[in-house]
């Protein structure tokens, strides 16, 4: 099972809580996190893009770095780990993104890939005059399909003449092209998002569900399996989880309860308001899960709470779901959490024995 880290490009990571660690994003912090991930044998890191936050007492995600420039910097200081940036497709033309990706591919010597997002939070784009109108909610993946076609044509042939509804290329050129096959991630959970992923992407990222229910996401993976059966492409699912661990189950649970007790109600209310703005999509989108009040303190991602041994066992259960290629992890405290994962959790995981074995071989 592959394991990656969703690095904190925005302030405070993924906890909307006054009781959680409070910090600003910086290149130095993300460099330390990425180097630790590489040191512990993890497979990749991914950075999101967020152009406007949720406010509240914690100013949640009001402070953010930019994804491509961050990953370009990380590409220059790493040697093995794979790096994925996120493209806000309403802001950046596909030909420019194709060239930026090719540049970071060169910096990283073929270790770069791309996450495509359609944009769901109107204020992010309206503030720049780039929101195309609320009818876009229902046509996001039509737009993204043309976008991906341009990317694929430029990366694979160096040229695009696509004439679509949203993009019109006229002998558009790209050189140099990426040295490695450029992998695309999508995180769409709607039927349209799944169909897009099955047609154009290589990985589908989905939310884990619940607390200590590591296989509850299985129905989402089943839906992707059905979608990719229609296209015949090899696409695997990766699942997002937050890890809150400690020496004992009780200590980890106490931290989780403490974070929940400090939930930033104002920021959570803003999340709910933005989620409700999309009246075009169905009930199966990511934002519907994120805004659910059940566990909005960490945007309702799957949460693994327990001792190091408990978390290791829970993660080993994830890979038992057919079609699952790996997990994307976030931590309440990234630096300590990553070290604990690398030294106390990963060595106990059956699904990561190949990594611990490689580490022992290097020492020998």
UniProtKB/Swiss-Prot annotation:
The lineage of its organism: Bacteria, Pseudomonadati, Pseudomonadota, Alphaproteobacteria, Hyphomicrobiales. It catalyses: uracil + FMNH2 + NADH + O2 = (Z)-3-ureidoacrylate + FMN + NAD(+) + H2O + H(+); thymine + FMNH2 + NADH + O2 = (Z)-2-methylureidoacrylate + FMN + NAD(+) + H2O + H(+). InterPro entries: Luciferase-like_dom (IPR011251), Luciferase-like_sf (IPR036661), Pyrimidine_monooxygenase_RutA (IPR019914), SsuD_RutA_monooxygenase (IPR050172). Belongs to the NtaA/SnaA/DszA monooxygenase family. RutA subfamily. The keyword Oxidoreductase applies. Keywords: Flavoprotein, FMN, Monooxygenase, NADP, Oxidoreductase. Pfam families: Bac_luciferase (PF00296). It is an enzyme of class 1 (oxidoreductase). GO terms for biological process: alkanesulfonate catabolic process; nitrogen utilization; uracil catabolic process. This is Pyrimidine monooxygenase RutA.
């Amino acid at each position: 099972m592959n394991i990656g880290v969703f690095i904190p490009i925005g302030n405070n990571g993924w906890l909307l809580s006054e009781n959680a660690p409070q910090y600003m994003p910086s290149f130095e912090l993300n460099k330390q996190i990425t180097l630790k991930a590489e040191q512990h044998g993890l497979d990749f890191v991914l950075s999101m893009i967020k152009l406007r936050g949720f406010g509240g007492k914690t100013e949640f995600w009001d402070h953010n770095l930019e994804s491509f420039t961050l990953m370009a910097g990380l590409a220059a200081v790493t040697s093995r780990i794979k790096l994925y940036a996120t493209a806000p497709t309403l802001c950046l033309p596909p030909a420019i993104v194709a060239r930026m990706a090719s540049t970071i591919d060169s910096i990283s010597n073929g270790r770069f890939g791309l996450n495509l997002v359609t944009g769901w939070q109107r204020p992010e784009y309206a503030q720049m005059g780039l929101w195309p109108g609320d009818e876009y909610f229902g046509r996001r993946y039509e737009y993204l399909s043309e976008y991906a076609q341009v990317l694929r044509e430029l990366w694979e042939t160096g040229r695009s003449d696509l004439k679509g509804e949203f993009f019109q290329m006229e002998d558009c050129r790209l050189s140099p092209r990426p040295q490695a096959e450029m992998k695309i991630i999508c995180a769409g959970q709607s039927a349209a998002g799944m169909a897009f992923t099955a047609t154009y992407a290589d990985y589908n990222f989905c939310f884990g569900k619940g607390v200590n229910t590591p296989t509850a996401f299985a129905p989402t993976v089943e839906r992707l399996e059905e979608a990719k059966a229609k296209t015949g492409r090899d696409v695997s699912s990766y699942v997002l989880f937050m890890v809150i661990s400690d020496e004992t189950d009780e200590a980890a649970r106490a931290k989780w309860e403490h974070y929940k007790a400090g939930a930033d109600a104002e920021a959570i209310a803003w999340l709910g308001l933005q989620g409700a703005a999309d009246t075009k999509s169905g009930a199966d989108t990511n934002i519907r899960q994120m805004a659910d009040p059940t566990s909005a303190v960490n945007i309702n991602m799957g949460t693994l709470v327990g001792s190091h041994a408990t978390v290791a066992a829970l993660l080993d259960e994830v890979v038992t779901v057919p079609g699952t290629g790996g997990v994307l992890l976030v931590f309440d405290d990234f630096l300590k959490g990553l070290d604990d994962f690398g030294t106390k959790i990963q060595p106990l995981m059956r699904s990561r024995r190949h990594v611990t074995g490689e580490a022992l071989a290097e020492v020998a």
